[in-house]
Amino acid sequence: DFRIHGYITPLAPQKSLRFYLKEKNLLNQLLDVNHNVDKIILRSSYSGWGNEIFVDGFIATICKNLNVDIMSYHPVITYINGEYWGIHGLRERMDLKAISNKYQIKKKKIIDADDKGYSKKNGYGKLNELLKLLKENPNISYQKVAKKFKMKSLIDWLIVELFFQNTDWPCNNTFFWKKKKISQFI
């Protein structure tokens, strides 16, 4: 099964597509992952479509050894039912199930939060409180932030986004998660 993927890319000339896999280990070797993958994305770049289609994948490849979760990237020429659909980035779909598979944590023991600060699970309110506190108090201590975030991950994430001048950040395509019994988001 598959569907069109994304919030904005459905408006683009080249659509991003999400596929639900029946065989969970079908693409593990190609994606270079050591866990089962149940959803993949053939991703197009809405903002960079036509002139920067490889940038996200290039950055992900450079950053794969940092303290941030990345979606592995492989450019693929896409045909659906014999019709050419363009060049897409083959990526694992990052969601709670992917985190659960990757880190061998039961899905029900994870709290997630998306880039808008929302979560379907209880427990994200404290992160919202911290983000509000950071906005209102620029002199907040490192220790207060470190109680809520895994600092190596947070610092690497900030460096990557700032160094590569991501104009689609921090408001889009960001995903925080943590174990329910641990206070730090990753």
For each feature predicted by the language model, list its residue ranges.
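Short, well-structured beta-strand/strand-turn elements
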Residues: 65-79
